[in-house]
Amino acid sequence: MTYRSRWLLPVLVILAALQLAACGDSEADQRKAFVAFLQSVQSQQDGKLPTLTEEQKKNFGNFTNDYAILTTFSQQFNQAVSGSLTPMLGQISRIRVPKDYLTQRDDLRQSIGAMNLLSQHVKAAKVQADNAHRLLKQPEEVQIPYERLYARTVIQPTNALLPAIPNAIAFAQSLIQIGDFLQAQGDQAVFNGSSVQFRTPQQVAQYNSLVAALPLQQQNLMNALRGITGVNYP
């Protein structure tokens, strides 16, 4: 019995070593697969994050949780934008003739309320992502491509969107102001397709003054939106 136990000991040691080696190989394979995936996503021009398949989740192991930080922020960001900025841009695009200032102003007022919350929602989502990001313990070969994708997915969209919010609100407020002015003129404002006529030179001057401020505000908004993936000025 003593002889048998001594003989089995090196066998058990060898088996344990083989198990550790297999585990090490598995982690290396997961790193390699995840790095290749990150590089593939980074090379895509549309900036979208693909949903992981069940096979990819298995191949990436715990790195699946690292990727979830990116997808969670992206979903929260897109949801916040689609509930505020996107509808506002749609309303702005429907203003084509002077009478449209009247028909769109109430919807624009509601959109401004949603836009005032957009900054809070995006900042909260970024804080959540940053907190999870700081806790990551990644090997260097994973960290380098992951940091690039984190910057593109989280940092850059946030930095581009936040300055665009006041630009969008200011532009919408100017459009509402024109609509309110036209409403106040009553039947003294006569709409004729792409033009509007007034009874007095003072009305014409005031209307022209309001409209004159729009091109610069519109250009500022367009410039701000260029840095936000998936958001385009209509």
Residues covered by each model-derived region:
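Sec-dependent bacterial lipoprotein signal peptides
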Residues: 1-21
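Leu/Val/Ala/Ile-rich N-terminal alpha-helices, chiefly Sec-type signal peptides and the beginnings
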Residues: 23-105
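Extended, non-membrane alpha-helical segments enriched in charged/polar residues
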Residues: 65, 173, 177-180, 216, ...
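Secondary-structure edge/capping motif, primarily at the C-terminal ends of alpha-helices
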Residues: 74-99, 133-136, 179-193, 225-228, ...
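Extended amphipathic alpha-helical interaction segments
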Residues: 101-197
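Extracytoplasmic/luminal low-complexity segments enriched in Pro/Gly and acidic/polar residues
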Residues: 191-234
